[in-house]
């Protein structure tokens, strides 16, 4: 037996069927010759903008295409730390598999295969970390929303330390979450993204110098190592870009609730926190995300726009000297 979802058309206010994509089915009101303008309008959770593969969110309220914050940062901000990390990872992988490398080097075909395998070491590691990070974020969201966690995830021994340390963080700092995995947007600067969470904490408020009821932006990072520093002094796994990303989410004026309702965002503190969550424990870092950091985000956006637009037309075709011109010069 199947059930058909129905909802009120926002235009004609009549009950209509809802398509699988969350839009009102095409319908024509009684006495009209043309379909109702409400046909095809998204309702419920379908009103929440989703990130496309091209890196844009489409707002169903205004029809605007809003560039993804992460896309902007990926295209406009250098990743120097990743270059060093990738080089170190390939070197470590080679040393761990030295006997196989020696054997493979004796034949051209196997040597090429091993070279290609080494070149992809950083990709494999990123995918592995990405899967872990996604799963941990799903666990955190379930904890925040007090919803059931699938047994396959909850009983995974690799994830149990993360859950325990996250719960310890919540207890230690008396955390109350007010939003999680929320899509936010700013029409003036034409961007959108999904923030990790907003929280309140009397202990954090005292540390950061803000009212106890102030919303504090938060993010979780699962990579790197606790208390480890990179060659340039950054925390291994928590980078300045986290504050830049957070500054954009803080600047966003609108957000979408889980039922699809668009709301104005409340004031958020100019200092957020990044939870560095690892199996061996956690660290909580204050991260600046005020207007001065957001200004840096606007510069990064301009670089991203250059890289995806004008940069493609900077270098022209190679010039060739015509024979007649060559003879005249001679």
Summary of predicted features, one role per range:
Residues 22-39:
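Cysteine-rich micro-motifs
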Residues 306-325:
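Charged phosphate-binding loop/patch that engages nucleotide di/tri-phosphates or the phosphate backbone
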Residues 3-5, 29-32, 249:
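Short metal-coordination and nucleic-acid-contact micro-motifs, chiefly zinc-binding Cys/His arrays
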Residues 16, 40-43:
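Cys/His-rich microdomains that often coordinate metals
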């Amino acid at each position: 037996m199947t059930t058909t979802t129905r909802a009120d058309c926002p235009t004609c206010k009549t009950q209509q069927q809802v398509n699988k994509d969350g839009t009102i089915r095409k319908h024509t009101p009684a006495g009209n010759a043309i379909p109702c303008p409400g046909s095809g309008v998204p309702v419920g959770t379908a009103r929440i903008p989703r990130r496309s593969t091209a890196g844009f969110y489409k707002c169903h309220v205004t029809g605007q295409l809003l560039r993804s914050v992460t896309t902007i940062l990926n295209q406009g901000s250098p990743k120097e730390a990743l270059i060093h990390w990738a080089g170190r990872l390939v070197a470590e992988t080679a040393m761990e598999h030295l006997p196989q490398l020696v054997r493979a080097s004796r034949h051209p075909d196997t040597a090429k295969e091993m070279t290609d395998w080494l070149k992809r070491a950083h990709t494999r590691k990123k995918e592995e970390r990405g899967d872990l990070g996604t799963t941990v974020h799903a666990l955190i969201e379930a904890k925040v929303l007090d919803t059931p966690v699938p047994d396959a995830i909850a009983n995974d021994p690799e994830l149990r330390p993360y859950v325990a340390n996250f719960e310890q963080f919540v207890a230690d700092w008396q955390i109350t979450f007010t939003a999680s995995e929320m899509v936010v947007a700013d029409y003036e600067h034409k961007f959108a993204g999904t923030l990790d969470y907003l929280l309140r904490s009397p202990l954090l408020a005292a540390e950061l110098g803000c009212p106890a009821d102030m919303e504090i932006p938060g993010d979780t990072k699962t990579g790197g190592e606790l208390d480890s520093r990179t060659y340039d002094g950054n925390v291994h796994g928590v980078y300045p870009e986290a504050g830049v990303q957070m500054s954009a989410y803080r600047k966003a004026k609108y957000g979408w609730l889980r039922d699809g309702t668009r709301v104005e965002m409340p004031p958020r503190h100019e200092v957020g926190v990044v939870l560095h969550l690892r199996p061996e424990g956690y660290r909580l870092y204050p991260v600046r995300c005020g207007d001065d950091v957001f200004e840096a985000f606007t510069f990064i956006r301009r670089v991203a726009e250059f890289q995806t637009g004008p940069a493609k037309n900077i270098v022209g075709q190679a010039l060739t000297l015509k024979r007649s011109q060559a003879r005249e010069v001679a």
